[in-house]
């Protein structure tokens, strides 16, 4: 059983950073528990089917888990947004953003001085999906 506290509005960002999204278990920990598991036990097959279809509840730790949920809720509170998404790496975050914005037939203009792995992603991978890329100098406005 977890207990989530309701915090007063207009808290200082420092307070939000350490207090938002803490759900204490029956053990009363003072910070998030880290869930070091790959999967979560389901009460029955019907519940399991619903969770796998809807994404509500926890099924497999790589798709979502209480530790990541707490991070996402805290980040959203700090940024003043309704939601946030956590990624396992910077490239994971970059790929998620790009895949959410681009589609086949789009053309992207990028600086040659971007992060190397991002350059590689556009130079070698996105063409396979019909996304064209032009690389330009960041300092030469006539290019």
Residue ranges: model-predicted function:
Residues 1-55:
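N-terminal glycine-rich, Lys/His-bearing helix-loop that initiates the first secondary-structure elements
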Residues 39, 44-92, 117-124:
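Conserved N-terminal alpha-helix of the aminotransferase class I/II PLP-enzyme fold
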Residues 60, 86-87, 111-112, 133-136:
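Glycine- and other small-residue-rich loops at beta-strand/loop junctions that grip anionic moieties
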Residues 77-78, 96-104:
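Alpha-helix C-terminal capping segments
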Residues 80-81, 107, 143:
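Well-ordered alpha/beta subsegment
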Residues 100-118, 136-137:
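Conserved PLP-anchoring active-site segment centered on the Schiff-base-forming lysine
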Residues 120-143:
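PLP-dependent aminotransferase-class I/II
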